[in-house]
Design a protein with these regions (language model features):
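Positively charged n-region of N-terminal signal peptides that target proteins for export
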Residues: 1-5
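N-terminal module-boundary/linker segments of secreted carbohydrate-active enzymes
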Residues: 25-31, 50
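Boundary at the C-terminal end of the N-terminal hydrophobic targeting segment
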Residues: 18-22
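Bacterial N-terminal signal peptides
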Residues: 6-16
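Formylglycine-dependent sulfatase
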Residues: 35-317
């Protein structure tokens, strides 16, 4: 399931135009000048220096290129992708797991019922962050099985830029929380790099998550950007799913405090529904006995719910 949420839009005042036709706010050449771009070429070509350079400082005029900002009305986006979760799991799509916040979002927005993916983690994720067929971006297999053949090398080239890179170049704050199954196994080094195929190398300015298909929820293989971290040390009861949510909230709070008008793109990818299944005790207690009717009865209930919601075709059978 993939969910996008618009939080706010950025408003800017357009007051000037540079030679390329880009719109500029503020005094052109000053350090606080900003500009929008058309996005047809990324990164955009550097503007021509507009100052004056003479033999002495007093006869020279400094000039800064305008900082790129998104266009007026650019939305903030939260994209949530859960792992190994069937279409009929959340209540939003007829499941028996209560998902009141997702229900609220779906009621206020759009609910897609024809969203197809591959049957593997890495290929699906490569497609969603690039908007391209997974073979065309190197992910015919999962990252751990990377092979030295076109379509299977687990390398997303720069000419197939990820959405993090595209939005960053257009002035967004970009971040990735949770599972990263789009870094090939041969780039798992934690000190020497290379890091081109890590989230930070694909345009995501901040990364807090783990590499590979799965990780322990209590002692995860966890990174902040490209540095391994161990937040569970000295914190009994630590849980990655909770920590990840807290870190995302902190990130957005800090971003809003420092740049309240800057739109963000947050790629939020929890791994808690993938093995190893390690929910906190409070969730085990909450759902104890809820599925004692068995799979067949549960399937019939979900099927009826989905037909009632209209998220599956109403057949005569």
């Amino acid at each position: 399931m993939k969910t996008a949420v618009v939080f706010y839009a950025l408003a800017i005042c357009l007051t000037a135009t540079v030679a390329t036709g880009q719109q500029v706010t503020g005094k052109l050449g000053s350090a606080d000048a900003t500009t929008t771009i058309n996005g047809k070429q990324l990164p955009p070509p550097p503007p021509t220096f507009g100052g004056v350079i003479k033999e002495s400082y007093k006869d020279s005029t400094p000039w800064w290129p305008p900082r790129v900002v998104p266009p007026k009305g650019a939305p903030s986006i939260l994209l949530i992708m859960t792992d190994d979760q069937g279409y009929g799991v959340p209540g939003t799509f007829g499941g028996v797991i209560p998902t009141p916040n997702l229900d609220r979002i779906a009621k206020a927005g759009l609910r897609y019922i024809q969203f197809h993916s591959t049957s593997l983690c890495s290929p699906t994720r490569a497609a969603i962050i690039t908007g391209r067929n997974h073979h065309s971006v190197g992910y015919g297999v999962i990252g751990e099985l990377s092979a030295g053949y076109p379509g299977y090398d687990s390398i997303i080239s720069m000419d197939n830029a990820a959405i993090g890179e595209i939005l960053k170049e257009n002035g967004y704050a970009t971040s990735w929380f949770g599972k990263d199954h789009n870094t090939p196994g041969f780039q798992y080094s934690t000190t020497a790099g290379p890091f081109e195929q890590w989230p930070t190398g694909m345009g995501f300015q901040y990364f807090y998550g783990f590499l590979g298909g799965e990780t322990d929820q209590w002692t995860p293989y966890l990174f902040r950007d490209t540095t391994q971290v161990y937040p569970w040390i000295g914190h009994p009861g630590y849980n990655l799913t909770t920590d990840m949510a807290d870190d995302a909230i902190r990130y957005l709070r800090d971003l809003n405090a420092s740049a309240p008008d800057k739109p963000f793109f947050v790629y939020y990818v929890p791994g808690g529904s993938h093995s190893p299944h390690q929910p906190k005790q409070e969730w085990i207690d909450k759902f104890k006995g809820k599925f004692d009717m068995g799979w067949e009865k549960l399937r019939e209930q979900i099927f009826a719910n989905q037909k009632s919601l209209g998220v599956i075709p109403r057949t005569r059978c």
